[in-house]
């Protein structure tokens, strides 16, 4: 795989609280320069990203219910609508992990369905936070996502105790079939990214995108 091909797997990411306007501007410039698929940013920066990415092919991805996923469903749906109105091209929502742990699967499904409906055709990725789930819970969550028809299931927020693993990516891909799988959290070098893709990942979320496509390792990145 060429570096240009690998770049098209990457959502170039900056989600930590301290990121300022210059950081987001730099992120957008890097995404254009290296041909990344998208930038993944908090929704408050969508207008800035829209301005910086004008005329390019780089998409704007934003997060909903991030990073805990424990918001009211109505708030997630409203957040989704507002983000799309502002210019988001893709939505990454966080599943309600607490409801999964409470075995409230109907509520989990309703939560995702409400955001999916709010997307109104905009691609939706559902973050499972796999490091907090059992294998059975991962499978069940993936089955719900597949039934609803979301675009992707995604491993992690990058804000918890663990990120993507090859094992979890493979399990997710095996469960969802033709739906996309996004590996995020801890993917910081070419070798790891390629291992995730081999396991079934069709998108990589990383703040270390430049290191990934250039064959170096980014020891500073946390996502």
Swiss-Prot record:
It comes from Haemophilus influenzae (strain PittEE). Coiled coil: none annotated. This is Deoxyribose-phosphate aldolase. It is an enzyme of class 4 (lyase). InterPro entries: Aldolase_TIM, DeoC, DeoC/FbaB/LacD_aldolase, DeoC_typeI. One of its GO terms (molecular function) is deoxyribose-phosphate aldolase activity. SMART domains: DeoC (SM01133). GO terms for cellular component: cytoplasm. SUPFAM superfamilies: Aldolase. NCBIfam families: deoC. The lineage of its organism: Bacteria, Pseudomonadati, Pseudomonadota, Gammaproteobacteria, Pasteurellales. The keyword DNA-binding does not apply. Catalyzes a reversible aldol reaction between acetaldehyde and D-glyceraldehyde 3-phosphate to generate 2-deoxy-D-ribose 5-phosphate. The active site is at residues 92, 154, 182. Gene3D superfamilies: Aldolase class I (3.20.20.70). PANTHER family: DEOXYRIBOSE-PHOSPHATE ALDOLASE (PTHR10889:SF1). It is found in: Cytoplasm. Its EC number is 4.1.2.4. GO terms for biological process: 2-deoxyribose 1-phosphate catabolic process; carbohydrate catabolic process; deoxyribonucleotide catabolic process. The keyword Lyase applies. Keywords: Cytoplasm, Lyase, Schiff base.
């Amino acid at each position: 795989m060429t570096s240009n091909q690998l770049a098209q797997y990457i959502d170039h990411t900056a989600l930590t609280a301290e990121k300022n306007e210059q950081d987001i501007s730099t992120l957008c410039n890097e995404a254009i320069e290296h041909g990344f698929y998208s930038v993944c940013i908090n929704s408050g920066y969508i207008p800035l990203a829209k301005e910086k990415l004008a005329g390019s092919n780089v998409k704007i991805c934003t997060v909903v219910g991030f990073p805990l996923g424990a918001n009211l469903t109505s708030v997630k749906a409203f957040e989704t609508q507002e983000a799309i109105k502002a210019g988001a091209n893709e939505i990454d929502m966080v599943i309600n992990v607490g409801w999964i742990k409470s075995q409230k699967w109907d509520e989990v499904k309703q939560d995702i369905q409400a955001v999916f409906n709010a997307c109104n055709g905009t691609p939706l990725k559902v973050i499972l936070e796999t490091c907090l789930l059992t294998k059975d819970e991962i499978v069940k969550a993936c089955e719900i996502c597949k039934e609803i028809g979301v675009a992707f299931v995604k491993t992690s927020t990058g804000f918890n105790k663990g990120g993507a693993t090859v094992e979890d990516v493979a399990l997710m891909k095996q469960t969802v079939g033709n739906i996309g799988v996004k590996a995020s959290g801890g993917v910081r070098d070419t070798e790891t990214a390629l291992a995730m893709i081999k396991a079934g990942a069709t998108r990589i979320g990383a703040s270390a995108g430049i290191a990934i496509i250039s064959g170096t390792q980014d020891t500073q990145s946390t996502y």
